[in-house]
Amino acid sequence: MSWWQVIVLAAAQGLTEFLPVSSSGHLAIVSRIFFSGDAGASFTAVSQLGTEAAVVIYFARDIVRILSAWLHGLVVKAHRNTDYRLGWYVIIGTIPICILGLFFKDDIRSGVRNLWVVVTALVVFSGVIALAEYVGRQSRHIERLTWRDAVVVGIAQTLALVPGVSRSGSTISAGLFLGLDRELAARFGFLLAIPAVFASGLFSLPDAFHPVTEGMSATGPQLLVATLIAFVLGLTAVAWLLRFLVRHNMYWFVGYRVLVGTGMLVLLATGTVAAT
């Protein structure tokens, strides 16, 4: 993998990780169009450490507050407030993707990274996001969050294992279907992603240097630079998205997904771009 490839792919990762447009899908598309290869699940997972570091810093106060409340609540029942429950909800919601990620690791690295799968998921899931935005009442705030919500959003997060779906797209959509307000759905989804993505990135670190089923590999310095680029752009992206969702809906992203997905389907159908 050249330095130019590293910079472009890391930029794509950082800019799209928190937007409901699928960062892994964009990495697959960009690497196939411009570099005639696949960045691979391992490079994606490791570069995600940069964007997840960004979300940790952005939500640092929330994380410290929730963790403190959770630890205190374990000892003193009187301290079991909303933040204490939120700590448990993050744990509960993380379990589904951890289990499926381990069981379907090989499938994620091979078959589901076919561009036909990626762009089809990009287009089809646009309909899910649009429907969630249309039917979501957005009447429930954080005080009314329950463990059932955590389970549903956690299961929705597993859909992000398929490139083209989008982690934030699936979790925000699930939250909207449950009646959560848009900003809460986004914030809870980001908190839910932190432990799962960090675990995935660390687990995939060795394979990023010596991929078994992927053609593009990176050196240690390249992975470091990719992580730093993804961190800076990811921090900018998460701050922008949360401000955007306060005043705007998800239809903007639906339109973008349909446009990119349809264009890619045409390129694939005409043989301009190879699916694998």
UniProtKB/Swiss-Prot annotation:
GO terms for molecular function: undecaprenyl-diphosphatase activity. The keyword Secreted does not apply. It catalyses: di-trans,octa-cis-undecaprenyl diphosphate + H2O = di-trans,octa-cis-undecaprenyl phosphate + phosphate + H(+). GO terms for cellular component: plasma membrane. It is found in: Cell membrane. It comes from the Bacteria. The chain crosses the membrane at residues 84-104, 115-135, 188-208, 222-242, 250-270. Signal peptide: none annotated. Its EC number is 3.6.1.27. It is a multi-pass membrane protein. GO terms for biological process: cell wall organization; peptidoglycan biosynthetic process; regulation of cell shape; response to antibiotic. Pfam families: BacA. Keywords: Antibiotic resistance, Cell membrane, Cell shape, Cell wall biogenesis/degradation, Hydrolase, Membrane, Peptidoglycan synthesis, Transmembrane, Transmembrane helix. Catalyzes the dephosphorylation of undecaprenyl diphosphate (UPP). Confers resistance to bacitracin. Belongs to the UppP family. Bacitracin is thought to be involved in the inhibition of peptidoglycan synthesis by sequestering undecaprenyl diphosphate, thereby reducing the pool of lipid carrier available. This is Undecaprenyl-diphosphatase. The gene is uppP.
